[in-house]
Each structure stands twice: as C-alpha cells, then as structure tokens.
Amino acid sequence: KKDQAAVRSGRKPEDVTLMAVTKLHTVDEINEAIDAGATDIGENKVQELLSKYPDVKPVRWHLIGHLQTNKVKQIIDKVVMIHSVDSLHLAQEINKRAGNAGLVMDILIEINVGNEESKTGINAEDLVPLVKEITGSCEHVRVRGVMCIPPYGEAPEESRKYFAETRKLFQELQQLDLPEDRAVIDTLSMGMSSDYEVAVEEGSTIVRVGSAIFGKRNYR
C-alpha cells in the first residue's frame, strides 16, 4: 500500500521509508520485525528505547516522541535521528551532547500543524526563524526536515489538508539558503498506521507505522 501511494505521488517506492513504531512492543516482536525486513524503528520514550536497545538486533533507531533536554545525553549515541525538536534550547543541548560524542545528529523540527494546545511542536510561522537560528549556532546538528502529527480525525482523508500544509512548509525550507553542512532538507516525516497512504500521496518520505505492522498495542 505504501508503495502504491508512492507511485501515485510520482515517486519510487524506495523514496519512502517505512518506520516500525515499537512503543509497548517487546524485544522479541521488534526482532521479528527486523528479521522481516524492518530497517528503521521509532520509539516514543527515552526510557523504553534504553531498556530495549541492548537486546534488539542492529537497526536504525529514531526518537519520535517528546524529548526533554536532560535525557538527550542518554540517547545521543544510540539514535540516527531525533524527529521531535521544537525549541532552540533543545537543539543546543543536542548540539552540545553530539559534539561531546564526536558526531553530528540529524534532526527534524516538529510542527504542531493543528495548533493543538495538547501537543508539542512549534507553530508554522516559527519554523523558518527556528531553523535559521539552529543552523546559525549548532555545528553538530544537521536539520533534515520536518515532522507533524495532525489532529486526530475519524477518516484518513481528514488529515490531507494538514499533510499538504506541512509539505508546503517543508518546501519553504528547501528554498532557503542554509549552510550545506548544517542542513540537508530531504525528510518529511508524516503519516501513521491510520493515514499513511494519504501522507505518502502528499509527499511524506517517512511513515511511522505501529499497529499496521504489529497489530493493536498491548496497553498494560
């Protein structure tokens, strides 16, 4: 389905990465998904990532949930990308910890595309100023694009306008003259199990899929 949606959006199937969201799933379930071909997995919580990390087979880990500055140092050498940067303060902490570890961390800026008070992420109008501030001051961070979680809707089609709006913001970033060593704007992380086909049609390059891979979560 992801591949068909990619073709509908005028792209090749390999242009879209399927990320397995492993929140509340066991190490065995995650390893089964890796055996079945999963290359990228996303965790929402730092503690959960750290508890599973030693026993999961080699894979590309992403942090997709809210990240507190005091937890950055715990994951800086374990993830390939942080999808949820929503402040200069957080970006600067990532920059500091990445510098200490001798690496450059890829990040996405999380946009609160529905302006929901209950969600983290920045407002659309703050995106360009924030990216300019980060690329101007953080040499161990590379901005790769944006991530959004649209307001919950009953039907996937309800998310389309939010995905289209996020894609426009992503394209605005691509037009900016940013330092090439600090920004490669190529990643649009949007779409989950319920609406990923619509997200891919609207240009997503990473879809975050949990229940469509693992079945319903085991809420303990």
Predicted regions and their residues:
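Gly/Pro- and small hydrophobic-enriched strand-loop and loop-to-helix capping segments
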Residues: S204-R220
